[in-house]
Amino acid sequence: MARLTAITSKQQVAPKDQPIVDAIVASRGALQGPFTMFLHCPELAGRLAHLGAFVRFEGTLDMRVRVLAAMTVARELDAVYVWGAQTGQARKLGVPETTIAAVRENHSRGVPAEDAQIVEFTRTLLRRHRIEDGTVKALRARFGDDGFIQLTGAIGYYSMLAMTVNACELEAAPGAEVLTPGATA
C-alpha cells in the first residue's frame, strides 16, 4: 500500500493547481502511477510531466531504446511500478522475452547487441556513475550527440520516477508484471 494517498482527481488539489492536473491528464490520459504521488507537490508534478512528455513522446530517440533504458532503470532501482509499466510496453514494441528476462535477472545472456548496448550503458551509469570513453564514442556514433543526451536524460527521468515510487511504496498496477526486488541470475 502506498505511503501517501494517491491523488487521482483534480478535486484533491487546490483550485490554483487544478490546471496542472488537467495538463497531466491531457498528456497521459489519466492520473496514475508516480504522478498520483508527485501531485502532493503540484508544481513539481507539472514540471516533471513536461519533461516526461519530451522523454516519452516527443524526443527523436527510438521508443524501443527509451523503453530498454526505462526497464533497466526499474530493475537497477527495484522500482516495482516502473518495471510493470515498462515491460508491458517493451512487449508491445517487440523486445524479445530473452532480453526482458536478462534485464530482470541482471545478466546479458541472449540479449541482441544493440539492446545490450543500451542495457549495459544504463547499468553502468547507475552503478558506477561514470562511463568509459569508448562507450560514449559508440553511443554517439549510433545516436549522435543529441540522441546520446536524450538517452542519458531518459535514464535520469526514469531514475526520478523509480526513486519516488520506491519512497512512496507504490505497487505495480493491477495486471502488470511484478518485479521481485533484488532478484539476480
Predicted regions and their residues:
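Hydrophobic alpha-helical segments
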Residues: 1-185
